[in-house]
Amino acid sequence: LYYWLYILAAILPAVVLVIYAYKQDQFPEPPRIVFKTFLFGCATILGIDLIIPILDDFSKDYFRGDTYHFFDSFIRAAFVEEFFKACVLIFYCTRKTAFDESMDGVVYGVAASLGFAAYENIEYVLYMDGAPSLDIALLRAYTAIPLHALCGVVMGFLISQSIFEKKQNYLNLFLAIFIPVGMHGLYNFSFASTLISYQIA
């Protein structure tokens, strides 16, 4: 039973933020689509787990010190994770007829990002210290989870702009990945040499 309490502690911050974003939409999205987007966000771990070992092998051979931390922060973590989140929005959410205003992208962006973050949080809370840890759940509730939510806001808004502002659609689509990668990478890199980096990055 106590394992479920740790899992609840891991996913609750993400769920609360998704609900908060959902309630900010003046014309709410279908809950079923938002929920599926959250689940697809969780499922991005399948693609991410295929790519990460390849990048790990590459980085061990070519990078040391700060260059390793830079690669690890901006490419291995930020780019890979944000790319797969963007795929959920582009190939699932934007094809729904309910996706008809910029705020919709924000809601779906938060849902996809926090779907991934919730799954990642479960792994951190249950396994990172060798035993379940509420301390890690609390720490990440104020660090990694809000980061993923913010990246989702930016990504979702810019993907919306790429659809509804046709003159700059390719630029907005590029920025929808580039800016969240920069935010995510800077966050990870800023903690790269600290004692808590393995808990919150």
Give the label of every model feature segment.
Residues 1-201:
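Hydrophobic alpha-helical segments at protein termini of multi-pass membrane proteins
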